[in-house]
């Protein structure tokens, strides 16, 4: 089970940032919901946010791939979170990779104001490269939890999200219809689709045949 920092009331205490990251289908949203519900049980004031563009399962709820849901507030920008989370003890943010770098500064300010901030997001894009702003969050957070899915090919722990379509956008919304988890060995980053890359490789040079007498 992922490590979780001790839940404390924030009356006069210093806040902190928790990061939950990993590939698709690794349980990031599920873990976020679990922590937020525990905070609610502890009678803390909880506010949950997600990017408005993410309507895959619900327009308003934070929903895991297992369809576990928690009511949230969709926002268009990170700055809105500052205005809406003023009275919260605990702030949860899902799909952080769909926000810009401003979200890091917003969460820093919330933590400095004594709030517990829990951020969940994808840490790599479909090419296997770091996906902002998650690397920056991992650098400033007090607690980082890295989750793994199960490789759809071999069953090993999966750290990558394999895109199954030909779409080239760095961020393409989707679920099992567009992605599956892959381990390092089974992950195949898409190849460039430029004209030059589609040319067949030149045949290997062969030694000349000896002349017959």
Curated annotation (Swiss-Prot):
<dbReference type="GO" id="GO:0005829">
    <property type="term" value="C:cytosol"/>
</dbReference>
<keyword id="KW-0479">Metal-binding</keyword>
<dbReference type="GO" id="GO:0008270">
    <property type="term" value="F:zinc ion binding"/>
</dbReference>
<dbReference type="Pfam" id="PF00265">
    <property type="entry name" value="TK"/>
</dbReference>
<feature type="region of interest" description="Disordered">
    <location>
        <begin position="185"/>
        <end position="213"/>
    </location>
</feature>
<protein>
    <recommendedName>
        <fullName>Thymidine kinase</fullName>
        <ecNumber>2.7.1.21</ecNumber>
    </recommendedName>
</protein>
<feature type="active site" description="Proton acceptor">
    <location>
        <position position="95"/>
    </location>
</feature>
<feature type="binding site">
    <location>
        <begin position="94"/>
        <end position="97"/>
    </location>
    <ligand>
        <name>ATP</name>
    </ligand>
</feature>
<dbReference type="InterPro" id="IPR027417">
    <property type="entry name" value="P-loop_NTPase"/>
</dbReference>
<keyword id="KW-0808">Transferase</keyword>
<dbReference type="GO" id="GO:0071897">
    <property type="term" value="P:DNA biosynthetic process"/>
</dbReference>
<dbReference type="InterPro" id="IPR001267">
    <property type="entry name" value="Thymidine_kinase"/>
</dbReference>
<keyword id="KW-0067">ATP-binding</keyword>
<feature type="binding site">
    <location>
        <position position="151"/>
    </location>
    <ligand>
        <name>Zn(2+)</name>
    </ligand>
</feature>
<comment type="similarity">
    <text>Belongs to the thymidine kinase family.</text>
</comment>
<keyword id="KW-0862">Zinc</keyword>
<keyword id="KW-0237">DNA synthesis</keyword>
<keyword id="KW-0418">Kinase</keyword>
<comment type="subunit">
    <text>Homotetramer.</text>
</comment>
<dbReference type="GO" id="GO:0005524">
    <property type="term" value="F:ATP binding"/>
</dbReference>
<feature type="binding site">
    <location>
        <position position="186"/>
    </location>
    <ligand>
        <name>Zn(2+)</name>
    </ligand>
</feature>
<feature type="binding site">
    <location>
        <begin position="22"/>
        <end position="29"/>
    </location>
    <ligand>
        <name>ATP</name>
    </ligand>
</feature>
<dbReference type="InterPro" id="IPR020633">
    <property type="entry name" value="Thymidine_kinase_CS"/>
</dbReference>
<feature type="binding site">
    <location>
        <position position="154"/>
    </location>
    <ligand>
        <name>Zn(2+)</name>
    </ligand>
</feature>
<feature type="compositionally biased region" description="Low complexity">
    <location>
        <begin position="193"/>
        <end position="213"/>
    </location>
</feature>
<keyword id="KW-0547">Nucleotide-binding</keyword>
<keyword id="KW-0963">Cytoplasm</keyword>
<dbReference type="GO" id="GO:0004797">
    <property type="term" value="F:thymidine kinase activity"/>
</dbReference>
<dbReference type="GO" id="GO:0046104">
    <property type="term" value="P:thymidine metabolic process"/>
</dbReference>
<feature type="binding site">
    <location>
        <position position="183"/>
    </location>
    <ligand>
        <name>Zn(2+)</name>
    </ligand>
</feature>
